Design a protein with these regions (language model features):
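Active-site loop/lid in soluble adenylation, ligation, and acyl-transfer enzymes
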Residues: 2-135
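Short glycine-/aliphatic-rich beta-strand segments at the starts of folded cytosolic domains
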Residues: 133-144
Length: 144
């Protein structure tokens, strides 16, 4: 419900941003009962280190609209209406296929992704300005 929305103040390199979070009490993890708001507040708290580790890279967003026990999907393209602080870079694959890919450069963009029901962020091993030149080795260890 729209009346249930909250607005979080998220510090960042361009100053504070206000990020609206709808359905803040939606339970994302049934055990131990973590809500969408708690996940967003966590990302506000760890915003600096999160951006240091994942920022300035194309990222795929793994979204769970009904929590982790519900259906999930991956989102790469920034949706229409994304705020101006959510960046994108045009990526091209060896096949020649190309599309815009989300790039998170500040904590407010990560909190916005939670608003879009993102639970897992999958950053590329390369930076947005050189998508064909990985500068990290990343190993994805899934618990299930």
């Amino acid at each position: 419900m729209a009346g249930d929305a909250v607005t979080l103040t998220v510090p960042g390199p361009q100053g504070d941003r206000e990020v609206r979070l709808s359905s803040p009490n939606r339970v994302i993890w049934p055990q131990p009962g973590i809500t969408k708001l708690e996940l967003a507040e966590y990302l506000v708290a760890v915003g600096g280190p999160f951006i240091e580790a994942n920022g300035d890279r194309p990222v795929s967003l793994q979204r769970f609209p009904e929590g982790i026990d519900g259906e999930q999907f991956f989102s790469k393209n920034p949706p229409k209406g994304a705020p101006d602080y959510v960046d994108a870079v045009e990526v091209t694959y060896p096949s020649g296929r190309h599309h815009p890919q989300v790039v998170i450069r500040e904590p407010a963009a990560a909190v916005w992704a939670v608003q879009m029901n993102t639970v897992v962020f999958h950053p590329w091993a390369s930076r947005a300005d050189a998508t064909d030149l990985p500068d990290q080795l990343r190993i994805d260890l899934d618990p299930y």
